[in-house]
């Protein structure tokens, strides 16, 4: 039996209020799940029309199931491993604007439409000068949205109360601002009246956002077991972790439109998304990158096993709480709560997150994710953070390319791999040689955007740690910073 509204008549059809660009796993497991929760727990009463941003997509499959699909959420919830599933029923239909262009534009004539959501990948918010305003669909997402907004502007004669709340989820910095700027470029390219540009500025609200949920997506390897468990066929099963966070930079009145507090979903409306983005990069991504060389050389292979390990788990926890959190400008309790949630996510028993999959481009990752914490810690405390410095030394050892007798498959820029190959191939075991390796790596300004040898005490500390790691092995060396 197939999942659709004929076979399952208990599902409600909601009035269409949300236009969503993107039908992929992430939006369905993140935004649509939250809309579903708000519908069921807070009487949001909002239906989502999904527009596929590319010619090839899933809307035909979505329409075959009348917008219904099953979402599994699996991971740790308040310390317990939880796997739960539900049918999401907020999607009313899907449209392919390449074959249904006029039907797509007609959505703009619906006075109840009030929100635009999108996730068209990092490359999606782009200006395409070949896009035209005519009878055929534009290629770019901002081009399509400009055409939609222009139809709305014309239909309602520039009524300022008919503007949209526009919330892009693309993983680029200042995504709302970039989308708005691109739309205004199209207004100029198409020679649209100045009143339209004014209406875009004054009647519409573009929000910058940060989204956070790991979504493995369609469970290809276990789909037969999933269908057997469900008792029906679903071609759009989706899988996400329990944790979710949606930070929206925008006005307070968004809380009146999205009843997230009543529904118990983790949406935060803030004045500035920047510290939240910094928090995620420094704590979540920074913890990953600082962990990899230490845990891998210790003999561990996954993030979960690393956090479970008595020594490495303690090392990582202390690194996050004692060395990263003190460098961030958000309320301490909020940072500690976020860090606790991150470490819990790392323990997700349903996901095998391999250290080597995170190890890709570790040098530039350390520069963007961990170096800012190291520098800020030194600035605020007047001393170096022991564990971040140790992780940096472990990174240099990692790029030796050996774990015991096995080779490490290093993956980084050609220049970085050459640098390390040259340094370690000339290694003669003397303390002077260790120091030369450290000085050369820390002085590689192309990666660090500065000469790290100029940071007081860093060259000595990294050299001392590198000697311990290389001579004693990671299991012994890590004890010195605990």
From Swiss-Prot:
The keyword Acetylation does not apply. SUPFAM superfamilies: 6-phosphogluconate dehydrogenase C-terminal domain-like, NAD(P)-binding Rossmann-fold domains. One of its GO terms (cellular component) is cytosol. Signal peptide: none annotated. HAMAP family: Altron_oxidoreduct (MF_00670). Gene3D superfamilies: N-(1-d-carboxylethyl)-l-norvaline Dehydrogenase, domain 2, NAD(P)-binding Rossmann-like Domain. PANTHER family: ALTRONATE OXIDOREDUCTASE-RELATED, MANNITOL-1-PHOSPHATE 5-DEHYDROGENASE. NAD(+) binds at residues 18-29. GO terms for molecular function: mannitol-1-phosphate 5-dehydrogenase activity; tagaturonate reductase activity. The gene is uxaB. Keywords: NAD, Oxidoreductase. This is Altronate oxidoreductase. Belongs to the mannitol dehydrogenase family. UxaB subfamily. It comes from the Bacteria.
């Amino acid at each position: 039996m197939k999942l659709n509204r004929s076979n399952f008549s208990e599902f409600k059809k909601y009035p269409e209020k949300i236009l969503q660009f993107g039908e992929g796993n992430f939006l369905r497991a993140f935004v649509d799940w939250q809309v579903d929760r708000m519908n069921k727990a807070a009487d949001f009463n909002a239906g989502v029309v999904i527009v596929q941003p590319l010619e090839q997509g899933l809307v035909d499959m979505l329409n075959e199931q009348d917008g219904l699909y099953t979402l599994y959420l699996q991971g740790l919830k308040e310390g317990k491993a939880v796997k739960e599933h539900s049918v999401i029923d907020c999607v009313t239909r899907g449209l392919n604007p390449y074959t249904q262009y006029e039907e797509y534009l007609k959505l703009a004539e619906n006075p109840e439409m009030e929100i635009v959501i999108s996730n068209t990948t990092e490359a999606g918010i782009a200006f395409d000068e070949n896009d035209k305003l005519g009878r055929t669909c534009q290629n770019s997402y901002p081009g399509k949205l400009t055409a939609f907004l222009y139809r709305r502007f014309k239909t309602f004669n520039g009524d300022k109360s008919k503007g949209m709340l526009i919330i892009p989820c693309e993983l680029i910095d200042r995504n709302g601002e970039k989308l708005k700027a691109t739309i205004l470029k199209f207004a100029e390219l198409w020679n649209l009246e100045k009143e339209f540009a004014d209406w875009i500025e004054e009647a519409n609200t573009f929000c910058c956002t940060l989204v956070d949920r790991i979504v493995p997506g369609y469970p290809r390897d276990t789909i037969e077991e999933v269908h057997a468990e469900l008792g029906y066929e679903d071609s759009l099963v989706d899988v996400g972790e329990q944790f979710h966070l949606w930070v929206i930079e925008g006005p307070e009145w968004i809380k009146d439109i999205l009843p997230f507090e009543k529904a118990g979903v983790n949406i935060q409306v803030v004045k500035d998304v920047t510290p939240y983005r910094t928090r995620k990069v420094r704590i979540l991504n920074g913890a990953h990158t600082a962990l990899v060389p230490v845990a891998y050389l210790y003999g561990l292979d996954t993030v979960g096993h690393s956090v479970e390990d008595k020594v490495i788990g303690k090392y990582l926890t202390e690194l996050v709480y004692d060395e990263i959190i003190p460098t961030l400008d958000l309320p301490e309790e909020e940072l500690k709560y976020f860090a606790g949630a991150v470490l819990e996510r790392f323990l997700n028993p349903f996901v095998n997150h391999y250290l080597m999959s995170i190890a890709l481009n570790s040098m530039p990752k350390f520069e963007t994710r961990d170096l800012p914490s190291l520098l800020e810690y030194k600035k605020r405390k007047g001393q170096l953070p022991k564990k971040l410095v140790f992780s940096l030394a472990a990174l240099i050892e990692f790029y030796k390319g050996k774990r015991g007798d096995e080779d490490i498959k290093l993956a980084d820029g050609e220049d970085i791999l050459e640098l390390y190959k040259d340094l370690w191939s000339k290694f003669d075991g003397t303390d002077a040689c260790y120091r030369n390796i450290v000085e050369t790596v820390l002085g590689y300004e192309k990666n660090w955007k500065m000469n790290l040898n100029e940071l007081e005490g860093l060259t000595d500390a990294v050299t001392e740690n590198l000697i311990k790691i290389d001579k004693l092995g990671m299991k012994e060396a890590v004890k010195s910073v605990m």
